[in-house]
């Protein structure tokens, strides 16, 4: 019984053990749950900070938070942080990608031992980012590779470290060479830059491992499908800087670089030259025995058309020559060349001095010319030879002179003899010299009319030089023959003088014939010009006379028409401006019927007034008002004149002709034809022709028919005041004073004269004073309601609007009453009449609205 008891008592303590294991398990589960939550919170914090990198405002804060997080990482949280950076490297924002790459290098620098196991994946992620289109991201990849190289490529290859160093280098170069194998120039270039930075940034470069890169680099440089040779060549420069150029690969490497020097891409050529410079600077011991081929290639490339390439090639060439020992020899060669050039120039100078001495000697002997005479005279040798010598002057500096050639050239055409001076010993010698001077003077006078090819004699002040003309006696002075002067050239002188004489005669005859032809041609041209000028003048004169005759006949026909109209209907209205507007033909008029209303310019500012319109100024007084009302501004003088002449018509010759011509009848065609033969009419025609179609508004002061019929009483008659006003206005127009012309017509107070002048000058408000402009506007406001004057008023209203818009509402100081009247009448005319068909200006309604707007007048008050 004791055994069960014992066993039962022994089994009881096992129950607390089960409960303790359960408690431990629950504690571990709660701890793992807490750590998992902490990991989740940390990841969320990291992702939040990374997302803040995309915003410039929160960028710096996010960087600081991430750096603090990196400093607090543990081996357990490191993979999670790296995965967050891997995922963020695919962010579309370049700023996020660049900062994540920098953070990778920062993590590796702080946790190099923990990240060594993740180095393969880190480098793969960096190489993957080389495909990015943003160059800033690729530069960040290069910097990150350089930072990692400085961290992990520290150990030297000594003893057992060789395998680990080679393994570390392999971790870097394997993904980079794989990227270089892609047919993408951007990726190839980025991988090459990363490899160059890796070699440069290695703290303790593993030379043996780097030397293994040379064969693969040579293979890529020789491969035509590799596109980024300009980026791969700096890798060779970096290997040369760290002393990692393998001697067995040097020859193939140089051949590849030589091929790159002949590339069509100037960036590749420049990179190849810089690589050769780096090899000469850092690997001179290796290349000392292999410089000839490289120097030859550089010599062929030193004149590259791209300046940066030329500079790089020149620098490399100097270094390679210096290594080969040819640089000093080159300098000595240059010095020898300069010395030889100097020696050659000295020799040429001596030869030139010898030639000058020879020419002086020959000049003293008298057989040839002196240098002065050779430079001045035209007959010493041909002009072609002189031109040839001038053209070849620069070439002669490097060649020997040929005195014999110049002697031959000068003796061929030399015809001058230099006679030495002699002292005047006695009277006989003086007389001999006088004879010689006289002979030379006669010869010179004979040759004064020769052309430039003739030989001219020269004499000094004492008569020491004379020309020989083939006579042996010309060389004899004072009964003695001058030895050695004329004898060698006497035959040549005879032949030359004979040929020159014949040539001179031929040239003189040709010259005389040419001068005669030129004079005849000049005379013919003068005669032709005179004939053309006379014909033109005659045509102009005839045209002027015909125009004058047409105007006179037109005036006669107009007067006949007026008289016929009075007989038919004394109170009938006139046409556009006068009854002649309906004349059946425009043959004798200077323009076609109805031309007055044609307005090609909407503003009509500054329109030239027609000369023909200056003559038909007369408007019957019974048509004074177009609206059936009397004119408001008729002066007493005009009313008195109208009362005096209303019964018998406006013209003074109607009163004179009342005894012979019945009322309402004009002169018959026969009487007009007979009157045209009168002296006065012929004189008028003659004067009209001399005027050359110049406007003569005073021509119709007295009817030409009355002048032609010999009404001498008209000469003593007092001149018509209306005619005087119109005559003065036309005179003002001719001198360009439009304001005075309108002042004269407005003072006369005759509406018809105002209408005629407005039509003649066109809108001219800009050339009037304020007072005259207001008077003209007063007439325009009343003419607006006349259908026949509507086009004139529209053009003047348009100019008024332009001036008001330009100078302001107070232009001309128009009173408010006149403004209101103009707007009211213009609005009324717009509602009742249509603008002319040829009107090209703005619509009349627009004129009303714009004028009312500028003048600040409410148009609605007119409706009320």
Curated annotation (Swiss-Prot):
Residues 1-26, 329-353, 426-504, 615-670 are annotated as: Disordered. It holds the Pfam family TOR1L1_C. It comes from the Eukaryota. Expressed in roots, hypocotyls, stems, flowers, siliques, inflorescences, petioles, cotyledons, and leaves. Particularly present in root tips and shoot meristems. The lineage of its organism: Eukaryota, Viridiplantae, Streptophyta, Embryophyta, Tracheophyta. PANTHER family: MICROTUBULE-ASSOCIATED PROTEIN TORTIFOLIA1. One of its GO terms (molecular function) is microtubule binding. It is found in: Cytoplasm, Cytoskeleton. One of its GO terms (cellular component) is cortical microtubule, transverse to long axis. Interacts with WAV3. HEAT repeats lie at residues 76-113, 117-154, 167-204, 208-245, 248-285. Residues 508-561 form a coiled coil. The modification Phosphoserine is found at residue 414. This is Microtubule-associated protein TORTIFOLIA1. Residues 449-459, 636-654 have a biased composition (Basic and acidic residues). Disruption phenotype: Right-handed twisting of petioles. Enhanced twisting when associated with SP2L disruption. Plant-specific microtubule-associated protein (MAP) that regulates the orientation of cortical microtubules and the direction of organ growth. Determines microtubule organization by modulating microtubule severing. GO terms for biological process: circumnutation; unidimensional cell growth. Keywords: Coiled coil, Cytoplasm, Cytoskeleton, Microtubule, Phosphoprotein, Repeat. Residues 17-26, 439-448, 489-504 have a biased composition (Polar residues).
């Amino acid at each position: 019984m004791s055994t069960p008891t014992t066993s039962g008592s022994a089994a009881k303590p096992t129950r607390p053990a089960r409960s303790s294991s359960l408690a431990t398990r629950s504690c571990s589960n709660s701890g793992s749950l807490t750590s998992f939550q902490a990991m989740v919170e940390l990841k969320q914090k990291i992702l939040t900070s990374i997302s803040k990198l995309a915003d410039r405002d929160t960028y710096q804060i996010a960087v600081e938070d991430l750096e603090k997080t990196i400093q607090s990482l543990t081996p357990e949280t490191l993979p999670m942080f790296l995965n967050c950076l891997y995922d963020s490297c695919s962010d579309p924002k370049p700023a996020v990608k660049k900062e994540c790459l920098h953070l990778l290098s920062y993590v590796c620098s702080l946790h190099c031992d923990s990240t060594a196991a993740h180095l393969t994946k880190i480098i793969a992620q960096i190489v993957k980012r080389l495909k990015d289109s943003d160059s800033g991201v690729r530069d960040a990849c290069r910097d990150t590779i350089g930072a990692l190289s400085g961290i992990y490529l520290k150990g030297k290859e000594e003893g057992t470290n060789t395998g680990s160093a080679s393994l570390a280098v392999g971790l870097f170069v394997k993904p980079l060479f794989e990227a270089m194998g892609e047919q993408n120039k951007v990726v190839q270039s980025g991988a090459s830059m990363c490899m160059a930075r890796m070699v440069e940034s290695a703290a303790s470069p593993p030379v043996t491992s780097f030397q293994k890169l040379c064969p693969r680099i040579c293979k890529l440089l020789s491969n035509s499908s590799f596109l980024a040779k300009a980026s791969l060549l700096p890798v060779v420069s970096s290997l040369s800087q760290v002393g990692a150029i393998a001697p067995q690969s040097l020859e193939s490497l140089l051949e590849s670089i030589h091929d790159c020097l002949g590339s069509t891409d100037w960036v590749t050529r420049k990179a190849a030259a810089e690589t050769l410079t780096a090899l000469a600077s850092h690997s001179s011991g290796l290349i000392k025995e292999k410089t000839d081929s490289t120097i030859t290639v550089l010599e062929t490339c030193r004149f590259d058309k791209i300046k940066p390439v030329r500079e790089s090639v020149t620098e490399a060439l100097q270094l390679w020559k210096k290594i080969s020992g040819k640089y000093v020899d080159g300098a000595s060669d240059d010095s020898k060349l300069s010395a030889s050039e100097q020696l050659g120039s000295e020799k040429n100078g001596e030869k030139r001095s010898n030639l000058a001495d020879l020419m002086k000697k020959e000049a003293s002997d008298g057989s040839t010319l002196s240098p002065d005479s050779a430079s001045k005279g035209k007959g010493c040798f041909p002009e072609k030879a002189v031109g040839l010598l001038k053209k070849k002057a620069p070439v002669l500096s490097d060649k020997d002179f040929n005195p014999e050639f110049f002697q031959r050239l000068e003796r061929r055409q030399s015809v001058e003899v230099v006679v030495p001076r002699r002292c005047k010993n006695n009277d006989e010698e003086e007389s001999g010299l006088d004879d010689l001077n006289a002979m030379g003077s006669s010869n010179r006078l004979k040759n004064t009319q020769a052309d430039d090819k003739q030989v001219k004699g020269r004499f000094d002040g004492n008569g020491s030089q004379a020309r020989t003309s083939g006579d042996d006696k010309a060389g004899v002075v004072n009964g003695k023959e001058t030895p050695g002067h004329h004898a060698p050239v006497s035959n040549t002188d005879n032949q030359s003088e004979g040929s020159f004489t014949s040539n001179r005669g031929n040239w003189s005859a040709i010259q005389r014939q040419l001068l005669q032809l030129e004079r005849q041609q000049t005379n013919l041209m003068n005669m032709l010009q005179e004939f053309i000028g006379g014909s033109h003048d005659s045509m102009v004169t005839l045209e002027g006379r015909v125009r004058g005759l047409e105007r006179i006949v037109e005036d006669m026909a107009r007067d006949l028409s007026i008289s016929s109209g009075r007989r038919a209907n004394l109170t009938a209205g006139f046409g556009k401006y006068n009854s002649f507007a309906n004349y059946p033909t425009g043959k004798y008029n200077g323009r076609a019927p109805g031309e007055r209303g044609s307005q090609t310019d909407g503003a009509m500012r500054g329109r030239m007034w027609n000369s023909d319109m200056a003559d038909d100024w007369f408007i019957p007084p019974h048509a004074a008002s177009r609206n059936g009302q009397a004119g408001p501004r008729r002066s007493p003088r005009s009313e008195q004149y109208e009362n005096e002449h209303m019964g018998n018509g406006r013209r003074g010759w109607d009163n004179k002709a009342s005894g012979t011509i019945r009322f309402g009848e004009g002169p018959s065609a026969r009487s007009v034809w007979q009157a045209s033969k009168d002296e006065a009419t012929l004189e008028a025609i003659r004067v009209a022709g001399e005027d050359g179609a110049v406007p003569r508004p005073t021509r119709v002061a007295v009817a030409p028919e009355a002048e032609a019929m010999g009404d001498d009483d008209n000469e003593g008659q007092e001149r018509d005041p209306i005619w005087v006003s119109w005559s003065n206005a036309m005179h003002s127009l001719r001198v360009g004073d439009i304001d005075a012309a309108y002042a004269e017509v407005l003072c006369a107070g005759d509406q018809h004269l105002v209408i005629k002048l407005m039509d003649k000058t066109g809108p001219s408000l800009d050339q009037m004073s304020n007072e005259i402009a207001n008077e003209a506007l007063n007439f325009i406001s009343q003419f607006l309601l006349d259908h026949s004057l509507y086009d004139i008023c529209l053009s003047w209203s348009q100019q008024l609007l332009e001036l008001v818009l330009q100078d302001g509402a107070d232009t001309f100081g128009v009173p408010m009453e006149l403004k209101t009247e103009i707007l009211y009448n213009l609005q009324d005319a717009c509602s009742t009449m249509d603008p002319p068909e040829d009107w090209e200006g703005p619509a009349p309604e627009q004129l009303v609205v714009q004028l009312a707007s500028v003048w600040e007048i409410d148009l609605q008050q007119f409706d009320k």
